[in-house]
Amino acid sequence: VQALAQLPELAAPVLALNHIDSPELAGTALFQFGLAPEDEAREVARRAWLEGYTRAAILVPESDWSDRVTAAFTDQWLQLGGYILEQQRYNPAEADHGPAITALLNLDSSQLRKTRLVRQLGRTLEFEPRRRQDIDFIFLLATPEQARLIRPQLKFYRASSVPVLSTSHVYSGQIDSERDSDLDGLQFCDMPWLLDENGNWQHLRNALTARRPAQSVRYARLQALGIDAWRITPYLDQLGGSMFGNYHGSTGNLQVDAAQQVHRTLQWAHF
């Protein structure tokens, strides 16, 4: 995509299946369409705001990818008027996320106060750590495997009543009631291809599943991207114009910005 953007001219409109970091460098004939996780992060921020939340805590893995997605969420959340009370990163290679969670909930501060009191009073105290009570929701970035570890640990550390909102990365793409039982109540956004059983693409999904069942889940989101790309390509000249507006696709409700990047509005579900 970067190479296409650097060309002085394109002979015909081109729909590239990815985004570049500097869309202003692209020519007027280059359109960019990808499954950008940043779009999902902004979607989470908008959803939380519509729910009436104003105070967020962020729990994300240690990675460059996570930093980019978190930045997109943070920018959107602050623009809406929200506050970020705490942000912690966890090691995705570990199973015990207690240190990150206790810091997120200020339980480490509660323990520190207890230690100081014991030192000052010189005697043992009965003590039950108290988490902070001002968090409206937690923005969680995690894979299904990580979320299945983190959600029970949040409950263990007395945060079972705090809503958790996440991106599509928390969902494997297929219902697994047994393995996902600990995720009950967790909200996430994802594409209609996986959530809407009444879409006009359902016959295509059924055909792909019947033909290649092993790949129908693993590559489901890429299949949806290909279908939407095929369907909107004839209308590239109209994309973003007042006559076209948006397109209700299998990857989401599609709109084009001034830099000719296609953005998605997703659907919501919960475990």
What are these model-predicted stretches?
Residues 27-30, 100-118, 133-135, 151-227:
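Extracellular/periplasmic periplasmic-binding protein-like sensory domains
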Residues 1, 19-24, 62-67, 90-95, ...:
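Solvent-exposed loop/turn segments at secondary-structure junctions
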Residues 203-271:
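Segments of small-molecule ligand-sensing domains
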Residues 1, 14-17, 55-61, 110-144, ...:
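Periplasmic-binding protein-like
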Residues 48-52, 60, 73-81, 105-108, ...:
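Sec/Tat-exported extracytoplasmic proteins
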Residues 1-89:
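Extracytoplasmic ligand/sensor domains, especially the bilobed periplasmic-binding protein
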Residues 16-21, 99-103, 229:
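Short hydrophobic alpha-helices and adjacent helix-cap/hinge residues
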Residues 3-4, 40-44, 65, 69-76, ...:
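Stable alpha-helical elements in mature extracytoplasmic
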